[in-house]
């Protein structure tokens, strides 16, 4: 299991933004915090780091997402 | 609450704190928790990778690094990290760490004992002390570099030491020296928070310095008006964020800088009061020198007048409109302008000249000395500034900005090291390209370097034209290559002797980042197997030389060169690995080193101050209340304690009158231009996922998967002309060598027609077989950014 702290920075277009927020809220891997202006605190929980990387890449590709910052990642070393 | 919920709640607190800070530009009300689990121990360290100098919090449990977080208390990164940073903990755990010394026997590397390995090194030194060299790195910690420097300059006294930083920032050094008389940027990262305009000169910080770039993007997100200008030879990720992307032809940057200066002069928008008070003018001489030849303002204006917009368009491919736009910005006094650059300007056969000219544009326009107004070079390695530029581990350098060629500097260094007068050799050693050329030349044909000890770098992949500079040595009798490293790099695999090293938080360390910030960390976990600190390796070799009678290993009182003592001042035999951590060797070496730092006003604080801080920017000066104060803006009265005479004081002025130099340098063509046989220009560089030659990042599965191999970017029109499709493998060939690699069309970077870009991180695709070793005549830094190549579809096997 990997737990990562993210900040998702949203663009300011209201329609796309609402759509993106709904998509993020529907994703069971994500726990959303309270947005602070354009910045949304997010916790991503995935089975492994590779899935986490793929998830971050997927978030970055959403049209209403300007950028994704990864703040911390909890990983296990074999 | 179970473990998963606990981790999620602490992660959410971290993310909320960062979001608050990003949104509001302020510290969160409550600091993020430092622990995510009761049995994880956290401590601070600077990131192992680039020169930005982000601080991370390192979580350890059971003798392993198990978690990484951005350090909320760090001014540099304010809790953020890039994709490499948050995986830095995994750097220690590649499957193939070197854990035992290895000696080449009958063509194979076989394990040997440390005792034997050290004796072999010592045998090589004693067999020919003059022909023994150390090739180091901007990844050395400060104490590691200092120990190697002292061994070579103060002990063996042959000055044969040079670092890989010669390949990445030597032209920035000569640019600062020739302009201000002293090295390293006057400004700092705070300028990024205050600038109205940021000009990236051939620089792609969105990938190379992403955390710094995020400061710019975040300002915009908060509503700040910030103009970002991308001066570039190809479209990059930085271009995507730029307000204006201005493409120029490779080597056209000198013409652009001269063209801006010409328009400032022609329009009368230069800053006459600043220039008349704080600047002199200089022009190039033949042979070139850092002092140049004086010129009057009228001569300078006359020389610059040749760089009309039409001529700049011809030389650089920049439109008169774009040039006028740049000159308009620099001509405005109401704006604060920061220039950023890195390898694009430094890896350049005119590297010193373009550095001088960009400083000159800032000085001529008065965009200097106010927060946000700064010409700032960035570095690529975590301690290129701290260990190379400040410790002076270059062939001509001594610590603290002193040089071996000046008698008074040698005398001062001999005093600090308690050496007999005359010990330090006044003749500089060989710079990097020359060192390796001589190592790859037969001994009876002038190849007078016969042993090189490589520490913390990978010259078999990072030197230019490696088939000329590196590989011939591997077949020459009498040449012996020693490599200290953590992984079996290409260099290690070509070595005669391999010494396994500890890395990053497996040892104590100190780095110095791009903004004069000195950083410290403590050992947190043990290195694997028999891997040991590089600093210990150097001291252990020195001690064996001492024991076998080498006279240079004693000071003038007969004490060992590295006289490490306990609290009662009794020597501690730290050359014995079992005793190495009985005392803090780093702290003692640093306290000795920092005595050098006052000569050029690069004052460092006591070691203990760095233990408390997330780095301090020099000069760090003790205050009347015995606290230590860092300096953000150098040469500026009110912040720099040594600037006392006027608002700005260049107190190490080349002309000894507290003035900086504004230079004129003419445009010159690159050493190799496209022709019928080799019609395209190759530029090499980096990607965000990987660092240097990828020896660490390619062993981090997440980063390796994200960018698994090198590629070549070419323009779609060139691909069509060559008949190659996206992903197809092509051969890139120069007059020196060739490589096969896949094409990436319309990818992350997009060069214009006629140009090719290849990243150099992939050890399996050796692009430096293709590059050329021509270098800047002053800095001796090679040009990796332009050489003539041809591309063809790969022939069928």
State the predicted function of each range.
Chain B
Residues 503-524, 530, 750-753:
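Catalytic or ion-translocation cores adjacent to nucleophile or general acid/base/metal-coordination motifs
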Residues 146-229, 254-258, 359-493, 502-509, ...:
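Extended redox/cofactor-interaction regions of prokaryotic respiratory oxidoreductases
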Residues 117-132, 188-196, 303, 324-338, ...:
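Glycine-rich phosphate/diphosphate-binding loops that line cofactor/substrate pockets in enzymes
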Residues 105-111, 269-320, 525-647, 682, ...:
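N-terminal leader/propeptide and maturation segments of large enzyme subunits in energy/redox metabolism
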Residues 135-141, 314-318, 342-349, 380-381, ...:
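Conserved short loop/turn motifs at secondary-structure junctions
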Residues 534-603, 677, 693, 697-713, ...:
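Long, contiguous, secondary-structure-rich segments that constitute the structural scaffold
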Residues 240-248, 517-528, 699:
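Short beta-alpha connecting loops at secondary-structure transitions
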Residues 1-269, 277, 281, 292, ...:
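N-terminal export/assembly segments and adjacent metallocofactor-ligating motifs
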């Amino acid at each position: 299991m990997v737990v990562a702290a993210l900040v998702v920075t949203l663009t300011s277009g209201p329609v796309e933004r609402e759509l993106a927020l709904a998509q993020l809220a529907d994703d069971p891997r994500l726990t959303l915090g309270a947005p602070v202006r354009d910045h949304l605190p997010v916790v991503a929980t995935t089975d492994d780091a590779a899935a986490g990387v793929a998830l971050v890449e997927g978030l970055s590709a959403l049209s209403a997402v300007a950028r994704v910052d990864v703040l911390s990642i909890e990983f296990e070393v074999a | 609450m179970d473990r998963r919920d606990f981790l999620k709640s602490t992660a959410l607190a971290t993310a909320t704190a960062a979001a608050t800070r990003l949104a509001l530009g302020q510290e969160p009300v409550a600091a993020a928790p430092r622990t995510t689990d009761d049995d994880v121990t956290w401590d601070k360290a600077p990131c192992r990778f680039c020169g930005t100098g982000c601080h991370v919090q390192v979580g350890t449990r059971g003798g392993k690094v198990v978690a990484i977080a951005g350090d909320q208390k760090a001014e540099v990164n304010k809790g953020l990290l890039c994709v490499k940073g948050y995986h830095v903990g995994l750097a220690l755990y590649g499957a193939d760490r070197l854990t035992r010394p290895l000696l080449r026997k009958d063509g194979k590397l076989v394990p040997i004992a440390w005792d034997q390995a050290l004796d072999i090194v010592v045998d090589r030194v004693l067999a020919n002390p003059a022909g023994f060299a150390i090739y180091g790195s901007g990844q050395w910690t400060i104490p590691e570099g200092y120990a190697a420097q002292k061994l070579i300059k103060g002990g063996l006294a042959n000055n044969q030491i040079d670092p890989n930083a010669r390949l990445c920032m030597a032209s920035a050094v000569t640019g600062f020296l020739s302009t201000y008389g002293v090295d390293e940027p006057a400004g700092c990262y705070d300028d990024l928070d205050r600038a109205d305009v940021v000009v990236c000169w051939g620089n792609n910080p969105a990938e190379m310095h992403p955390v710094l770039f995020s400061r710019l993007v975040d300002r915009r997100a908060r509503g700040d008006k910030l103009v970002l200008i991308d001066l570039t030879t190809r479209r990059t990720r930085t271009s995507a964020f730029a307000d204006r992307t201005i493409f120029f032809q490779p080597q056209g940057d000198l013409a652009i800088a001269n063209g801006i200066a010409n328009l400032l002069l022609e329009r009368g928008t230069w800053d006459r009061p600043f220039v008349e008070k704080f600047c002199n003018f200089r022009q190039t001489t033949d042979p070139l020198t850092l002092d140049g030849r004086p010129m009057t303002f009228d001569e300078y204006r006359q020389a610059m007048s040749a760089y009309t917009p039409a001529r700049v368009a011809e030389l650089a491919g920049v439109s008169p409109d774009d040039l006028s736009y740049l000159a308009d910005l620099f001509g405005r006094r109401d704006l604060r302008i920061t220039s950023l650059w890195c390898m694009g300007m430094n890896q350049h056969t005119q590297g010193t000249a373009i550095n001088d000219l960009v400083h000159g544009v800032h000085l001529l326009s008065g965009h200097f000395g106010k927060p946000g107004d700064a010409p700032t070079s960035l570095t690529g390695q975590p301690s290129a500034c701290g260990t190379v530029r400040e410790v002076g581990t270059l062939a001509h350098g001594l610590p603290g900005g002193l040089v071996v060629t000046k008698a008074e500097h040698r005398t001062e260094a001999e005093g600090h090291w308690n050496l007999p007068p005359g010990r330090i050799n006044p003749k500089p050693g060989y710079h990097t390209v020359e060192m390796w050329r001589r190592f790859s030349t037969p001994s009876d044909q002038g190849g007078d370097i016969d042993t090189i000890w490589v520490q913390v770098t990978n010259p078999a992949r990072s030197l230019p034209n490696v088939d000329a500079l590196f590989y011939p040595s591997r077949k020459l009798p009498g040449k012996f290559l020693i490599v200290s490293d953590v992984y079996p790099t290409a260099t290690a695999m070509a070595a005669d002797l391999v010494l396994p090293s500890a890395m990053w938080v497996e040892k104590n360390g100190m780095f110095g980042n791009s903004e004069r910030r000195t950083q410290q960390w403590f050992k947190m976990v043990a290195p694997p197997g028999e891997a040991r600190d590089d600093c210990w390796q150097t001291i252990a070799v020195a001690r064996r030389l001492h024991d076998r009678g080498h006279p240079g290993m004693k000071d003038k009182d007969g004490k060992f060169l590295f006289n490490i003592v306990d609290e009662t001042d009794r020597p501690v035999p730290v050359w014995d690995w079992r005793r190495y951590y009985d005392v803090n060797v780093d702290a003692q070496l640093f306290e000795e080193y920092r005595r050098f730092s006052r000569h050029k006003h690069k004052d460092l604080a006591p070691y203990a101050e760095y233990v408390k801080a997330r780095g301090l920017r020099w000069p760090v000066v003790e205050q009347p209340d015995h606290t230590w104060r860092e300096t953000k803006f150098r040469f500026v009265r009110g912040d720099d304690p040594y600037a006392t005479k006027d608002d700005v004081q260049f107190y190490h002025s080349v002309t000894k009158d507290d003035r900086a130099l504004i230079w004129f340098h003419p445009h010159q063509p690159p050493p190799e231009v496209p022709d019928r046989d080799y019609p395209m220009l190759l530029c090499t560089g980096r990607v965000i996922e990987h660092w240097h030659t990828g020896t660490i990042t390619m062993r981090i599965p997440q980063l390796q998967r994200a960018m698994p191999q090198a590629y070549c970017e070419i323009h779609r029109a060139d691909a069509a002309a060559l008949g190659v499709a996206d992903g197809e493998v092509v051969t890139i060939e120069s007059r020196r060598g060739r490589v096969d690699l896949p094409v990436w069309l319309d990818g992350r970077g997009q060069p214009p027609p006629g140009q090719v870009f290849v990243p150099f991180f992939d050890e399996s695709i050796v692009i430096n077989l293709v590059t050329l070793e021509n270098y800047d005549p002053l800095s001796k830094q090679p040009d990796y950014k332009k050489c003539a190549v041809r591309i063809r579809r790969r022939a069928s096997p």
